């Protein structure tokens, strides 16, 4: 059994609750355990994963959050830099499922976050589980 850490950016709590529900369900159904920690926004997710990884307590991570396009350039920065930060950590060998949604509006986020619809939290957890199993096989 592996220990997964879900790191969620708690900016849109009602959407994140659904993402977490989907992720936890996927992890637990696969026979693993998980914990959840919260950070203020998507840009803080890579730093939190780095801090948690340094403890040696976790085998894999799931990054969850919602970034909704607004009227300023801020969306592009947050969407791009949070994805870049997560990707850099995976290239350094960490196992991370990226479930940071980048959407045009709240309705798109709702459909993607809902475990009964697109279930992107569950998908991110399943990606992390798959990569954890691959890393274990190749080690």
From Swiss-Prot:
Pfam families: DMRL_synthase. GO terms for molecular function: 6,7-dimethyl-8-ribityllumazine synthase activity. (2S)-2-hydroxy-3-oxobutyl phosphate binds at residues 71-72, 112. Pathway: Cofactor biosynthesis; riboflavin biosynthesis; riboflavin from 2-hydroxy-3-oxobutyl phosphate and 5-amino-6-(D-ribitylamino)uracil: step 1/2. The active site is at residue 74. Signal peptide: none annotated. Belongs to the DMRL synthase family. This is 6,7-dimethyl-8-ribityllumazine synthase. It comes from Zymomonas mobilis subsp. mobilis (strain ATCC 31821 / ZM4 / CP4).
């Amino acid at each position: 059994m592996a220990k997964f850490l879900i790191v969620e950016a708690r900016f849109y709590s009602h959407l994140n609750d659904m993402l977490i529900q989907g992720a936890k369900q996927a992890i637990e159904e696969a026979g693993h355990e998980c914990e959840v920690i919260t950070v203020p926004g998507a840009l803080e997710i890579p730093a939190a994963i780095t801090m948690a990884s340094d403890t040696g307590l976790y085998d894999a991570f799931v990054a969850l959050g919602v970034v909704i396009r607004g009227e300023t350039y801020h969306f592009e920065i947050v969407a791009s830099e949070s994805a870049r930060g997560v990707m850099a950590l995976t290239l350094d060998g960490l196992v991370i499922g990226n479930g940071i949604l980048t959407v045009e509006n709240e309705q798109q986020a709702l459909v993607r976050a809902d475990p009964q619809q697109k279930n992107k939290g569950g998908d991110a957890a399943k990606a992390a589980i798959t990569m954890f199993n691959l890393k274990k096989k190749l080690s």
